[in-house]
Swiss-Prot record:
UniProt organism field: Nitrosomonas eutropha (strain DSM 101675 / C91 / Nm57)
Annotated GO CC locations: plasma membrane
More about this protein: Carbon 2 of the heme B porphyrin ring is defined according to the Fischer nomenclature.
The name this protein goes by in its record: Protoheme IX farnesyltransferase
Topological category with respect to the lipid bilayer: Multi-pass membrane protein
């Protein structure tokens, strides 16, 4: 009996390591946009069963994709300061264990989506998994500095998945949400790549600051932020959203543009770090504004 507390403690630590493989902070933002997509897809209440099961299914597959990313890049992660503390580089979980875990978790998520949501959502989610974990992580990321731009399509899919989970179809409004995240992805990741340039150079990863230099990357952060600001006004222009969203997004855009201009004109690593952190808050608040406006539209 005296060994029971130790056994439970060891089991808890193991569970925590597998949980860390799913990159919960990253996945939480992904799932949040998917859930908002669910609410925006219908004028009234969202069916509770589809909301819960759709969220669980999408979360599990997103976690599996993150785990596969960790598996593919664990040797690189061991070199980079930002990632060397992850479970695989630390040897806290093995490669076979990670592979088994992601297959089981991802398979369960796809089963839930097919069985209790609809086949369209399951196939779209599987396509998103393949796009992120294989096309982006395995092929594009080590091949081209445009990896973020091309691979951003898979990262922009969650609100479309949420929309399809409730309605069983893809609408033009869902594609607007896709467009917003697609435009958001380059300035978000390039801000990170700027102040982590030495890490990426160390592992030979062709991120834009490594291949084209800081000045070129800073310019593209600004250009893509301008594109993002244009894209985020489209929900209002198409009458998908109203004044609450418009006022909110103009404020959010102004702050993002402020950071992008500072990155371009007066770059420091600290400014890039602040811009990266703000970009996460920005996306969360933008989708929150979409949700509030959806139910209080005027």
């Amino acid at each position: 009996m005296s060994t029971n507390p130790l056994v439970w403690q060891q089991a808890t630590v193991r569970i925590q390591q597998f949980y860390r493989l799913t990159k919960p902070r990253v996945v939480s933002l992904i799932v949040f946009t998917a859930v908002i997509g669910m609410f925006l897809s219908v004028p009234g209440a969202v069916p509770l069963d589809k909301l819960l099961l759709g969220t669980i299914g999408i979360s599990l597959v997103a976690g599996a994709a993150a785990a596969l990313n960790c598996l593919v890049e664990y040797k690189f992660d061991a070199i980079m300061a930002r990632t060397k503390g992850r479970p695989l580089p630390q040897g806290k979980v093995s490669v076979p264990e990670t592979l088994f875990f992601l297959v089981m978790v991802g398979g369960l998520g796809l089963f839930i989506l097919h069985q209790w949501i609809n086949p369209l959502t399951m196939w779209l989610t599987l396509g998103t998994f393949v796009g992120y974990a294989i096309i982006y992580t395995v092929i594009l990321k080590p091949l081209t500095p445009q990896n973020i731009v091309i691979g951003g399509a898979s990262g922009a899919m969650p609100p479309v998945l949420g929309w399809a989970a409730i309605t069983g179809e893809i609408s033009a409004d869902a594609l607007l949400l896709f467009l917003i995240i697609f435009a958001w992805t380059p300035p978000h990741f390039w801000a990170l790549a700027l102040y982590r340039k030495s890490d990426y150079a160390k592992i030979g990863m062709p991120m834009l600051p490594v291949t084209h230099g800081e000045e070129f990357t800073r310019l593209h952060v600004l250009l893509y932020t301008i594109i993002l600001c244009i894209a985020t006004v489209l929900p209002y222009l198409t009458q998908m959203s109203g004044l609450i969203y418009l006022v909110s997004v103009l404020i959010l855009d102004a702050i993002f543009l402020y950071y992008a201009i500072r990155i371009y004109l007066h770059y420091t690593d600290q400014i890039a770090r602040e811009a990266f952190r703000y970009s996460i808050i920005y996306l969360a608040l933008l989708f929150t504004a979409l949700l509030v406006d959806h139910y209080f539209y005027f």
